[in-house]
Every structure is written in C-alpha cells, then in structure tokens.
C-alpha cells in the first residue's frame, strides 16, 4: 500500500493508536488536538513517536470557508473549534499541493430511499461473513414470481410477522387415514439425501472468515479502498467531520490507512418539520422545538451524495402510548416536573449547607467545634428527598407512564 504524501491527523488517530508512519509520509496536526488528549497511555505514546509530527495552523480564510460549508450541511453544531481547524488545514493542504478546481462549493441534495427494515437493524453482523447469493425467482402456476408480494401496500408487514406453522405432518396423517398414496420411505430417504447434499454444498466455505478472505471482508464492512494517487487525506473517526470532508470532495482515511468511500452513521430527523441534525444528544428539535426526533440511518458516498434510508415499517412511528395525563405542575425549591420543552427552567436542587461543608483543620479560618468530623445531614429537606449532585436539573425521570419499567428493583 503506497503511503499518502500528506496526512492530517485528528485526535481519534492518536487515541486509536493508528500507525501513521505507515499511512503517510508527512503527518500534520494542530496543537489543540494534542492539548485535548487526556489519556495517560496516549500521551505517553505521543512523547516517543517514531515519526516527525508537524504542527501547522490553517489560514483564517480556509477556516471561514469550512465553517460556511459545514453550516450548509447541518454539521456545524456537532463540530468543535478544533474540528473546524483540522478541516481547514486539510483544505489548505489540498489547495497547496493539488488545487481546488475539483472541490465542491455547495453540498449536494439529499437522496431518499425506503427500506422495509427497522432503521436500527444491523447491516452487518460482527464475526460473520454472509455473502449475498442471488436466488432465481420460482415461477408458480399463474406465472408470477413466488418471491414478489402480490400487493406492495402490505409488503412492510412481511418482515415482522411470525413464520407460518408447518402442517405437512398433519396432511400426511389425513392421507393415510383416507387410504391414498403416500410416498415410500425409500423415496423420502432419496429426497432427504439430496437435500442434505445440497445443504452440505452450501456450507462448504460459505460464511466462514478465513485468512484468504479477511481483507475482502474488512473492505466490505468498512467500505474502504486502497488509497491510490491520493496526495492529501484526513484521518478522523468523527462522522460529522467525515460527512463534511466527503461532501467537499476531500479524501478521508480510516484508522487502518484505507480510503473511506462511504460513511455510514445515524442522524436525528424531525417528523414534524422534516429538519435533520447530527447531534445525537438532542431530545427536542432545534427548529420547531417539538419532541419529534427519530433516528434515521444515512450513508455518505465518496462523491458527497447523502442518502437517507427511511423505513416503511409501521412500528417506527407508532403513536401508541403517546397520549397520557400530565401531573399538576408544582412549585417550590424541590419541585420535580416533567421536561416538556427545551428551555424549561428547573430548580437547582442543591444540597444543604450542612451537607456541603468540609472539615479542613489546616484552613486559616477553621474554628474547632464539638467534633472534628463532618456532621451527616439527615434532617434537611434535600436529605429527606435524597438529592444528589448528579441530579441537578434532571426533572421528572419517568415522564411517560406507559413506558416499560424495570421490575424486581431493590428498595433502599
């Protein structure tokens, strides 16, 4: 594998311990990337790198260009200042050594495709290689294919229904009672032997991961190719950065040094106003403010095309259990109300002063009391409500009474 001439490394490259000396000839990064790494083992590896790490700051004009492009793609809220500088440095190196004539100034439109599977159904199973084997369509007596549904309107339910029971044994018993011809045991053994041989032929070498096909399987799972004639690339594991790079026309490298042709991830799409966001931590829509965000799988190809895969499964947008009565709003310092809007204000729920005090005998203003130990607060309002520092502004934990809850929980 020919190394890339210029590689811009993100923090994910150092955290994943990527062999950058084998991936690129010249390794670039910014000082903010090294500063934000807090892992002790990673910082220990950074002290003894087997290659020269070059620090270079991007020009303000490229930072401004990348910022405007990320706002158009919708990834700007998910990018930090360090991420934008890494993207700008990649764009700057591409402009210096290759040119900007092939780069895009506007993101392409989103293409929509539907699927009968659930959006969270795994596309690949880790540890198993399941190659696709095309099967010829079986013709029925009417001349129609048996694998195609007669009505496409109900095709989405075929994936979720339970398999039909096998009634061959009961039919054979009815034929024996009526005295009709039943196939002999020898014929059944011949048919079973033919099926066994067919199954054995399917199992030979199919579905197993071997040293001969491990490279092919890794490329299929990661949608990666060998980087050929690539002079500038960015090695990152962040999907928002990969999305911006691919839509701009820049090259994205994986941790193993392969060239990423397609990036797969999930985004949140509001089914009320149809706006999307890549910030998976959001609960309410940033455009309309409703709690109508749903997870949608997306793929970004190497030409910058963004595909959103919607599901025709009716269970994805099931309105069951969404209508329920809300409790009466309560006031006060320790009120716990349901979280209904994003800008809703909650009480601070702080601990009492007695619970927050600490004993420091070496403090200059320390006053010796009856006991040198900290008193345990058990009588204040916050202590009786079991308020902790981790629950600041958490609101009502279980908003929907129709939601499932754990049983057999140990009581305090």
From Swiss-Prot:
SMART domains: PINc (SM00670). Its EC number is 3.1.-.-. One of its GO terms (biological process) is visual perception. One of its GO terms (cellular component) is cytosol. A zinc finger (NOB1) spans 260-332. It is found in: Nucleus. Zn(2+) binds at residues 270, 273, 285, 288. The modification Phosphoserine is found at residues 184, 201, 325, 352. It is an enzyme of class 3 (hydrolase). Residues 5-108 form the PINc domain. It holds the Pfam family WRNPLPNID. One of its GO terms (molecular function) is zinc ion binding. Keywords: Endonuclease, Hydrolase, Metal-binding, Nuclease, Nucleus, Phosphoprotein, Zinc, Zinc-finger. Belongs to the NOB1 family. PANTHER family: RNA-BINDING PROTEIN NOB1. May play a role in mRNA degradation. Endonuclease required for processing of 20S pre-rRNA precursor and biogenesis of 40S ribosomal subunits. This is RNA-binding protein NOB1.
